[in-house]
């Protein structure tokens, strides 16, 4: 293996780190859209947070693992104002400072529809004691931890759920056995679908659904649509591709192609 190829297996030097964790932030899609930038990774983050917000029922206690700059909060204020509580965990003081700034702006717009707490902690270490949560978000963050620490964090997330509670977990989909080259070198370890399912089940959860949230190349989308739904779905996709901006179509079409999608959203449940 050449030195250049070997580099692809390691987190890029200069990536913001705290110990073994990458604290590189996910795209701030709100800021990007405000200046006219619409790219699939930003729209992916918007979509996955909107999926969660629209599914939060009244009175739900919500935990955001590795909450970063608090990107889930605007959609929760807008679409789920009747949740009972939000708690955000993150290892980075800088990330939490951004989240608090965002919350201040949201409170000016929406008031205080639900209490919000931010807690600085290492999510792979023992967590503070909380009452059980009905919803746990763990979006686009697992890949920022080494594998074994990620397994521990998933066990803690599973233990934090009330019976019947739901974990929304998203992470890039890696293919083949480890060691694997990183798709994004701000990450530490990228998981295969099988590794995620194994760790989630070991945490006492069942996987109810898996959807793509970031697409492969269009020819791979076409191939999986044909396998799943037949030639009519391919014609439909191509018809949309001729009309719909790619960033929007990529985000939506990825939901239907989880076998080839480059990022997945797992919907996992603690049995009642």
Region spans (language model):
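N-terminal, positively charged/glycine-rich alpha-helical extensions of SAM-dependent methyltransferases
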Residues: 1-32
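Conserved alpha-helix/loop element of class I SAM-dependent methyltransferases that forms part
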Residues: 42-58, 75
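Class I SAM-dependent methyltransferase SAM/SAH-binding core
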Residues: 71, 75-124
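A conserved beta-strand element that flanks and buttresses the S-adenosyl-L-methionine
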Residues: 137
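A short glycine-rich, Lys/Arg-flanked "PGG" loop and its adjoining helix->strand segment in the class I
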Residues: 151-163
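A C-terminal cap/extension of S-adenosyl-L-methionine-dependent methyltransferases
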Residues: 168, 212-272
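Short, glycine-/aromatic-enriched active-site segment of Class I SAM-dependent methyltransferases
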Residues: 169-188
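Short alpha-helix
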Residues: 189-204
